[in-house]
């Protein structure tokens, strides 16, 4: 997500709920997912996650990209093991400092290319631009983190083949500088689980598939999470659908605001029970009410002291 995701894109999601019934829904202790049958999915076997659970941070839009993260408060809440940091493409210098600080405070780091103006785009050139950004900036950012190639690329309407083709090209570019896991946000603002699974395993003859096996599929889960491919709001069966890809899976974002219709809490609990990493939205940086600490950067970007907000336990109790 982003400040714009929570003010612009989140508003966009709200409009989709009102106008089309589609809305935004979401790194990394991963489950090696197992094959599911199409008619009656088998339970996904539980495995301990590779990374611990944690929280999202979205600092690009506040205090020139240099807000105070409140590390001391975060460290006092020890269920937070992983931080997913969203990076606007013009914030490389700032992001280097964010990543260094997260390392020095002992966190597992997921770094996410986030371009607020193109969330949900099917334009493959935008995904290629993200890949080239990583190629240019990975070493500058200091390494030591997992790459989330691009936040929420791909609409509810993209086909498995188109999604796979675009990601094959983008992943090949990133591989010139990085050999670790690559997190792939599934299409439809993180909600089209069946599309993503088919993009990996292939669901039709001759279909293009994502060929790189060192990837993790990431869903984003909110109350308005809509699975257009299934014509309904997301439910726990979508966790099994995504698992049928045979790749590790995670919930890269979750929160309790933005639309209604999906049991976001039950879905997150189910994913966690299967061993998936879950990452709450957000420690700080949301443009609305989903900030675990107060003051929010949106209200005071220069704040240096923080306390728990009323939203804190919505996320923390899930971790």
Residue ranges of each PLM-predicted region?
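An active-site-proximal structural segment forming one wall of the substrate-binding cleft
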Residues: 67-80, 87-114, 119-149, 161-175
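N-terminal pre-catalytic segment of deacetylase/amide-hydrolase enzymes
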Residues: 41-85
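Bacterial Sec-dependent N-terminal signal peptides
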Residues: 26-48
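Extracellular glycoside hydrolase catalytic/binding regions
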Residues: 52-59, 64, 72, 125-144, ...
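Glycine-centered signal
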Residues: 2, 12, 28-32
């Amino acid at each position: 997500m982003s400040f714009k995701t929570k003010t612009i894109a989140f508003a966009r999601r709200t409009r989709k709920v009102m106008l089309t019934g589609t809305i935004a829904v979401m790194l990394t202790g991963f489950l090696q997912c197992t094959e599911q049958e199409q008619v009656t999915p088998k339970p996904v076997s539980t495995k301990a996650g590779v990374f611990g659970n944690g929280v999202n941070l979205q600092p690009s839009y506040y205090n020139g990209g240099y807000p105070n993260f409140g590390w001391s408060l975060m460290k006092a809440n020890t269920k937070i093991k992983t931080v997913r940091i969203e990076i606007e493409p013009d914030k490389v210098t700032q992001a280097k400092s964010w990543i260094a600080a997260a390392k020095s405070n002992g966190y597992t780091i997921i770094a996410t290319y986030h371009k607020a103006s193109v969330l949900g785009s099917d334009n493959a050139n935008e995904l290629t631009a993200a890949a080239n950004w990583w190629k240019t900036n990975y070493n500058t950012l200091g390494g030591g983190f997992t790459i989330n190639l691009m936040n929420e690329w791909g609409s509810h309407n993209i086909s498995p083949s188109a999604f796979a083709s675009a990601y094959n090209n983008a992943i090949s570019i990133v591989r010139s500088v990085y050999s670790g896991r690559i997190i792939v946000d599934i299409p439809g603002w993180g909600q089209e689980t069946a599309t993503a699974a088919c993009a990996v395993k292939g669901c039709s003859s001759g279909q293009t598939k994502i060929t790189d096996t060192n990837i993790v599929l990431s869903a984003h889960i909110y109350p308005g999470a809509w699975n257009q491919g299934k014509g309904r709001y997301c439910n726990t069966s979508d966790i099994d659908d995504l698992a049928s890809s045979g790749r590790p899976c995670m919930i890269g974002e979750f929160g309790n605001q933005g639309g209604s219709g999906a049991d976001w809490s039950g879905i997150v609990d189910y994913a966690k029970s299967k061993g998936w990493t879950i990452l709450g939205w957000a420690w700080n940086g949301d443009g609305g009410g989903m900030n675990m600490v107060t003051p929010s950067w949106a209200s005071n970007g220069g704040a240096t002291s923080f306390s728990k907000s009323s939203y804190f336990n919505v996320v923390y109790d899930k971790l």
